[in-house]
């Protein structure tokens, strides 16, 4: 909510918000190699975005993970020519995954690496493994010049992630806040944001419908503006984080229509619940005769989200202006 207290902060920041194209917005096209990593740079540039967030596997045979050093360097060179920042993402926190993501980040000139854990086991055991993974990141890469974010990704609660970051004592580690992933941990967006707020530096923007499951909640991602997420309120809170300077340095535009994630945490769980193993995020492909239309729609949805987010930002700006001038 825009208030007199935060209206000036909003007006100072809203027009220069660092929006990043997120590769998952083109997930189906990239799985079928219709959109490739270099194409994301062109799309980001054409839409006047600050940079791209791309997974090491996006683009399948043509992914960053399959590029040689020369190709990675060329990708980084193209980004710099277009004045775009690069963030690298990986969907694990183990040594091999981190090493791969960091190597790609350094070879492309990226500034940041996102990871999230995917372990099975009782909560305390899982948190211990993750803490060890983070210790490896700190000991090996804290002087790499990269920043690191751990994303809240459906299975851990906000306070658990905050504890991991605080206990790591790693200055270059912070939290990436996703608009919907807390739902699956049986939390709600504004509550999760308030808990994580002191440690959030990056964001994934999307919308989703909350799906009630026995004892818990799932989410089905949808077109931004058509879901249950408090879209404008979340953006307003995030813009205002940081006193003198904006705390959030990257907002990833992650439209992911039709992605579904089930409940992972439940109302009746004990204090050391079982955390099930989860696969990497994936949106189902349609049947062949529907494929071309679905791929076209995915591209349209991605561009429409950019426009929707900018429209919401202008609404927030207008509310701030109105408050200060009346």
Swiss-Prot record:
InterPro entries: IolE/XylAMocC-like, Xyl_isomerase-like_sf, Xyl_isomerase-like_TIM-brl
Name of the molecule in the record: Uncharacterized protein YihM
Lineage: Bacteria, Pseudomonadati, Pseudomonadota, Gammaproteobacteria, Enterobacterales
Provenance organism: Escherichia coli (strain K12)
Origin: domain of life: Bacteria
Gene3D superfamilies from the UniProt entry: Divalent-metal-dependent TIM barrel enzymes
Coiled coil region boundaries: none
């Amino acid at each position: 909510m825009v208030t007199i207290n935060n209206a000036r902060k909003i007006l100072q920041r809203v027009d220069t918000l660092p929006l990043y194209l997120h590769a998952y917005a083109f997930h189906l096209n990239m799985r079928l190699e219709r959109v490739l990593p270099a194409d994301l740079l062109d799309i980001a540039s054409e839409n006047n975005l600050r940079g791209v967030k791309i997974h090491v596997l996006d683009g399948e045979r043509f992914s960053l993970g399959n590029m040689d050093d020369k190709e990675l360097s060329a990708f980084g060179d193209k980004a710099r020519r277009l004045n775009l920042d690069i963030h690298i993402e990986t969907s694990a926190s183990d040594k091999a995954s981190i090493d791969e993501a960091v190597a790609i980040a350094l070879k492309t000139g990226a500034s940041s690496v996102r990871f999230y854990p995917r372990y099975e086991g009782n909560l305390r055991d899982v948190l211990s493994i993750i803490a060890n993974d983070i210790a490896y990141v700190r000991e090996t890469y804290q002087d790499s010049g990269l920043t690191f974010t751990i994303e809240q990704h459906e299975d851990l609660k906000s306070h658990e992630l905050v504890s991991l970051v605080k206990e790591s004592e790693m200055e270059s580690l912070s939290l990436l806040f996703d608009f919907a992933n807390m739902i699956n941990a049986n939390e709600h967006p504004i509550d999760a944001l308030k808990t994580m707020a002191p440690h959030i530096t990056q964001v994934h923007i999307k919308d989703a419908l909350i799906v009630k499951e026995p004892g818990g909640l799932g989410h089905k991602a949808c077109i931004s503006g058509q879901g249950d997420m408090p879209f404008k309120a979340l953006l307003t809170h995030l813009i205002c984080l940081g006193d003198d300077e904006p705390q959030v340095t990257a907002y990833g535009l992650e439209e992911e229509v039709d992605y579904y994630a089930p409940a992972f945490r439940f109302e009746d769980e004990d204090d050391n619940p079982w955390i099930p193993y989860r696969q990497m995020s994936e949106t189902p492909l349609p049947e062949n005769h529907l494929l071309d239309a679905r791929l076209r729609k995915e591209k349209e949805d991605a561009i429409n989200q950019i426009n929707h987010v900018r429209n919401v930002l202008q609404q927030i700006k207008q509310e701030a202006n109105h408050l200060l001038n009346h």
